[in-house]
Amino acid sequence: MTGLERQLTEMLESAVVASGYELVGLEFIRAGEHSTLRIYIDHENGITVEDCAEVSHQVSAVLDVEDPISVAYSLEVSSPGLDRPLFKPAHYEQFIGQEVNVVLKMAVANRRKWKGEIHSVDGEAITLTVDGQQEEFALSNISKANLIPKF
């Protein structure tokens, strides 16, 4: 998580929670002149398009007042989806036993991309079962992690 993403999470979480939703996480993606702030929300009853519109309205109001982003960007609010991104230690704990794709900031054993089943979480690191072997990764070294949907 970048410094800006951390700042945005702290700034927006209370608005999302006050609307009755969980802020799963967010990503600020810079792609040349077209940046995107993508916010993932969830609710025990699932997420509808109307839910996304409501949260978008609330979040936009906060962003308009605080103005933390200095470049033009698009705001997207969505459910985490089947390939749910994992941002917090609690997310990894919630999905112990599920298969994930993990991209690391710094390579471990000459690899940045890993695929395995979440075996355990200790707060600072996760352990994946990869090809029958246990591999431990510091949460601070994880750039991106997504569930692999089962069909």
UniProtKB/Swiss-Prot annotation:
GO terms for biological process: ribosomal small subunit assembly; translation. The keyword Cytoplasm applies. The keyword Cell membrane does not apply. It comes from the Bacteria. GO terms for cellular component: cytosol. InterPro entries: Ribosome_maturation_RimP, RimP_C, RimP_C_sf, RimP_N, RimP_N_sf. Its main location: cytoplasm. It is found in: Cytoplasm. Keywords: Cytoplasm, Ribosome biogenesis. Belongs to the RimP family. Required for maturation of 30S ribosomal subunits. This is Ribosome maturation factor RimP. It comes from Vibrio vulnificus (strain YJ016). The lineage of its organism: Bacteria, Pseudomonadati, Pseudomonadota, Gammaproteobacteria, Vibrionales. The gene is rimP.
